[in-house]
Amino acid sequence: MPFTSEIISIILLAIGLSMDGFSVSLGLGMQQLRLKRIAYIGLTIGFLHMLMPLAGMLLGQVISEQIGQWTSFAGGVLLFLIGAHMFFSAFRLTEGFRWQPVGVGLWIIAFSVSLDSFTVGLGLGISGVQIFVTLFAFGIVSCFLTWLGMLIGRKVYRFLGVYSELLGGSILCGFGIFILFS
């Protein structure tokens, strides 16, 4: 994949992965958090959106040496399945328990919205993507979208909440299909 199209794909993937954090931050924004707390939450989520896929990529590279030619196919299928899960989970009828974004609760929130980044990192590690560029994009985009979500969350959570998860899942599915057929 040429470098420019890889960058565009990585940015789109970063946006897709960050939609979980964006959705959660829309809800957190309704708690009237101070700007300092909003900044800290965004940085924490951005950090874990870099750390989790790094762990997945490293494991994915080890696995790719073992399974050879099937690596791109496996990575594409994995990304598609994650996106499909994210897309369909947007249709849940019940609202789950929400942790408060302080101390351990903040790390649990950040970990839960970053967990899908680990499995995406696994798929990307198998496909041999540029690690530094990918991690940087994941961290920056997730941090920015978390901040943005908290700042606008007070006014539009009920309108965008479900749609942001649908969009994120669609982007992941599309990226998985792109890898499968390229």
Swiss-Prot record:
Q: Which family does it belong to?
A: Belongs to the MntP (TC 9.B.29) family.
Q: How does it sit in the membrane?
A: Multi-pass membrane protein
What name goes with this protein?
Putative manganese efflux pump MntP
Instruction: List membrane-spanning regions.
Output: 7-27, 38-58, 71-91, 106-126, 131-151, 159-179
Name of the encoding gene: mntP
The UniProt entry's GO CC annotations, sorted and at most eight, read: plasma membrane
Q: Which organism is it from?
A: Oceanobacillus iheyensis (strain DSM 14371 / CIP 107618 / JCM 11309 / KCTC 3954 / HTE831)
Subcellular localization is given as: Cell membrane
Enumerate the PANTHER family for this protein. MANGANESE EFFLUX PUMP MNTP-RELATED
> Which GO molecular function entries does the Swiss-Prot or TrEMBL record give?
manganese ion transmembrane transporter activity
Supply the alphabetized keyword list.
Answer: Cell membrane, Ion transport, Manganese, Membrane, Transmembrane, Transmembrane helix, Transport
> What's this chain's function?
Probably functions as a manganese efflux pump.
